[in-house]
UniProtKB/Swiss-Prot annotation:
Cited InterPro entries: ATPase_AAA_core, Bact_Antivir_Def_Nuclease, P-loop_NTPase
The organism of origin for this protein: Methanocaldococcus jannaschii (strain ATCC 43067 / DSM 2661 / JAL-1 / JCM 10045 / NBRC 100440) (Methanococcus jannaschii)
GO MF, one annotated term: ATP binding
Protein name in the entry: Uncharacterized protein MJ1542
CDD domains, A to Z: ABC_ATPase
Keywords: ATP-binding, Nucleotide-binding
PANTHER family the record matches: ATP/GTP PHOSPHATASE, ATP_GTP PHOSPHATASE
Binding-site residues for ATP, renumbered to this chain: G35, P36, N37, N38, V39, G40, K41, T42
A Pfam match: AAA_21
Cystine crosslinks: none
Length: 808
């Protein structure tokens, strides 16, 4: 059973950084999103907030243009898939009870005769669906809900099994037993005609429903009011090609005519339930899925014994944000209004602090009375009774914060914690205790805790350690942030809480403890979305709801980290999610150093030549061997994290191998045709069926072919010159490496982002004494010299790399 409303997917078309974007979430309660700056992470939250603002009419169609991804395309769409929880269904059930009492008493009577609770039957179908908003130059629709009729789909599957067992392709009238009709009613022509008509209506309607399901593989029901409210166009995906006529008019316009016969028919329970649900949906459509307040009030006067309908109406009115005292000014409330309000009330954005700021759900005079009593210790017993009375009469369903007069927004934490701590509802008091427990866990080394007190007749918070008390406004920002986040995460239930980089001010130790709290989702009664830049929150517990956002060109894309980690662990047979992996995942780009260069202090050298490596989140990784290289390369490739390969030119362009003659003298022999340096051969073999994500396989193969052909052509030239053997490294550099580097360097740098350093790039301390005259050509760092010209080349190369990959 779903504990709370959950967002299952979010889709956005032509909005912000999203071209045609959809992200789907797994069953976990915590969703983690990370990635470089300015790639669209926060835009995901902005899309959810935009939908909320459109629902509550805080934004007009004219203002929407600034949100468009492509300003020339005057169209946009948002679709948010959700699963409802028990409390959401309770609200919908109250609405449906009122609706059917007012608009379909004949259907209720019919269902009662069948011993079928129409509300219970139909509310089961309100389990999941999509909030949809779409806008174009022609028209901007009000957001509506596309209900996924999963239970009805299950009923149809059972009907299909029922038919298969009888070797039938469709429901026939013979499957509906009318013997009871003949036995209990007159056998006149009229009764027989009504019975036959009724059986035909049932079979044709449910058969049409089965056909629609088989065409679509899913069943939907839209709450969009567009003047085309009929059951035929509303069941299914709305595609005209998939429409199958469902004819129920004869039955619905005169239920009384068929009632006596209908209740005496015997049929498969799934066929009966499917037909009744169709009747109910048809009634909803016929009345524009709305309850008209005037009709409800008239019904209440005529049926004073029905106290429930007025209580349900009050609940619905307040749920929709109206004051019941203004009931006569309210014309109607639609099912769409209810469903949209569920969405609006469910979202809590961290930057907003609270979703219903300014709405005082408990009268101010009661607050003043309560606070005055709390100040006077002699009224302790009266105070307790006042608190109980206050919170017993408050609306705890929405868990709105305690609006203390005109309390500024920064005071919401004391107000809300005061509300939880003193609530008559034990469940709410336990939330306060949980917040306090988690706060003390995070600060256990400092023995910190907090309490809610009254200061100047207003709730306030003091933080204390042993005998020292500090007001909340005097503690560090990190402590405040932790209390805010704990209050949001543990102080609410049935919410979708969206936290945008909430941990930036927190010391790493506290981030780590927070991550441990979020690993255990058993005590979290809301779905939590977190945008962050911390490695501590990337863990195996939530890995399948962990996503990396990136923007390869102008549109945001994402990668599910869990799927990648699972594939890599299967491929390499080892644990992938380690400390280095987490650092890579959070980086903007990675530099892979060959083993020969692993000791280069790259970040320190970059400062000498103003190479802007530290302006970006760059990780330098030093693979220990080919397997290690393969693991990190695959991770980078799957996650589309840009990378640089940095190695010595001696490796990439060398066609010679070192040998020793009989006297032990070192010489260099030209390798046979098709033979290269060992590392080059390993990499060529590795890339046989792979290619960097930023270029196509064809383009990559073309570059590799140019590389190999150039090496082979130069090998032939060396043979012609008689350079089969060379006597020194300097000769290998002069006749082999440098000529090849000049030919291939540009294409390898610009296409594959391979940067090579010459053999004399590094000057060891003992050799520095011999180059004092040329010291201005070297940077000396920790007694080792590095060629300045190579670093200047790397700066140009790095600038090109940044621009190519659009690093922000």
């Amino acid at each position: 059973m779903v504990k709370f409303m959950k967002i299952k997917s979010i889709a956005a078309k032509n909005l912000l950084s999203f071209d045609d974007f959809k992200i789907t979430f797994e069953d976990g309660d915590v969703v983690t999103i990370f990635g470089p700056n300015n790639v669209g992470k926060t835009n995901l939250f902005r899309v959810l907030k935009l939908l909320r603002n459109i629902i509550n009419e805080k934004i007009s169609a004219v203002d929407l243009e600034i949100y468009l991804h492509n300003k020339n395309l005057k169209a946009a769409k948002i679709e948010v898939d959700v699963i409802f929880d028990k409390s959401d269904k309770e609200v919908i059930a109250k609405f449906l009870k009122i609706f059917f009492k007012i608009n379909a008493p004949d259907l209720i009577r019919l269902c009662n005769n069948l011993k079928l609770n129409i509300i219970n039957s139909i509310i089961d179908y309100f389990s999941a669906g999509s909030y949809i908003w779409e806008c174009s130059e022609l028209r901007c629709y009000r957001p509506y809900f596309m209900l996924r009729l999963r239970s009805l789909e299950e009923d149809i599957e059972k009907i299909k099994i029922y038919l298969k067992e009888r070797e039938l392709s469709e429901i026939t009238p013979d499957l509906i037993d009318h013997s009871k009709v003949i036995h209990e009613l007159d056998r006149n022509v009229e009764i027989i005609e009504v019975t036959n008509d009724l059986k035909n209506i049932i079979t044709s309607s449910v058969n049409a429903l089965i056909t629609i399901y088989e065409k679509n593989e899913k069943l939907f029901f839209s709450t969009l009011i567009d003047g085309k409210e009929n059951i035929t166009t509303r069941i299914g995906d709305g595609n005209i090609e998939n429409i199958v006529e469902i004819s129920m008019k004869d039955f619905t316009k005169d239920i009384e005519k068929y009632e006596d016969c209908f209740k005496r028919l015997t049929m498969d329970k799934n066929i009966l339930r499917a037909f009744v649900v169709l009747l109910a949906l048809d009634k909803l459509l016929a009345n524009k899925m709305s309850i008209y307040v005037k009709k409800v009030l008239e019904y209440s006067k005529e049926n004073p014994w029905d106290k429930e309908i007025i209580e349900d109406l009050k609940y619905i009115v307040r749920f929709c944000g109206f004051d019941y005292r203004d009931i006569y000014e309210i014309s109607d409330i639609s099912l769409n209004d209810i469903l949209l309000k569920i969405y609006e009330n469910s979202l809590i954005f961290y930057e907003d602090y609270l979703p219903n700021e300014g709405k005082v759900m408990i009268p101010d005079y009661m607050i003043v009375e309560l606070l005055a009593g709390l100040k006077n210790n002699s009224l302790e017993k009266n105070v307790k009774s006042k608190i109980l009375e206050l919170f017993k009469t408050s609306t705890t369903k929405d868990d709105l914060y305690l609006g203390i007069l005109s309390m500024p927004s920064e005071k919401w934490i004391p107000s809300y914690l005061f509300y939880l701590k003193n609530n008559a509802n034990l469940k709410l008091r336990k939330r306060y205790m949980k917040i306090k427990e988690m706060f003390e866990y995070i600060f256990n080394s400092g023995s910190l805790s907090f309490d809610v007190i009254l200061a100047n007749n207003k709730p306030d918070i003091v933080v204390y350690s042993e005998d020292i008390e500090i007001p909340l406004n005097m503690v560090g920002l990190g402590v405040k942030k932790i209390l805010e986040i704990l209050t949001l995460v543990f102080g609410y239930e049935s919410k979708v809480i969206l936290l945008d980089t909430p941990f930036n001010q927190l010391y790493p130790k506290y981030q780590k403890r927070f991550s441990k709290i979020l690993k255990d989702t058993e005590n979290i009664d809301s779905q939590v979305f977190i945008i962050l830049h911390s490695p501590y929150f990337i863990n195996n517990e939530n890995i399948f709801n962990t996503f990396r956002f990136y923007k390869p060109k102008k549109s945001t894309k994402y990668i599910c980290i869990g799927s990648i980690i699972k594939d890599l662990e299967k491929t390499f047979g080892t644990v992938i999610l380690d400390r280095t992996t987490r650092k890579i995942l959070l980086s903007d780009a990675v530099i892979l150093l060959s083993s020969a260069l692993r000791d280069i202090p790259l970040f320190d050298l970059a400062e000498y030549e103003d190479i802007p490596i530290d302006e970006y989140n760059i990780e330098v990784i030093r693979p220990q061997n080919t397997l290690s290289f393969g693991k990190y390369y695959a991770l980078l490739q799957y996650t589309s994290i840009p990378y640089i390969l940095m190695l010595r030119s001696w490796i990439l362009y060398n066609l010679y191998e070192e040998i020793k003659d009989g006297e032990g003298k070192v010489r260099y022999k030209l390798l046979e045709k098709g033979k290269y340096h060992k590392i080059v051969e390993e990499r060529l073999n590795f890339f046989k069926n792979r290619h960097p994500f930023w270029i196509s396989k064809e383009e990559f193969d073309k570059v590799i072919n140019i590389y190999i052909k150039t090496l082979e052509a130069h090998r032939e030239k060396l043979i012609e010159l008689g350079y089969i053997y060379l006597s020194s490294k300097e000769e290998v550099v002069k006749y082999c490496i440098e000529p090849l580097r000049k030919q291939l360097e540009d294409i390898l740098r610009k296409k594959l982002f391979i940067f090579t350093v010459p053999t004399d790039f590094i000057i060891e301390p003992q050799d520095l004494k011999n180059i004092q005259i040329e010291k201005d050509k070297y940077i000396v760092h920790n007694y080792i010299g590095y060629r300045k010209d190579v670093l200047k080349e790397f700066k140009e190369f790095f600038d090109y790399f940044v621009k190519f990959h659009n690093l922000q």
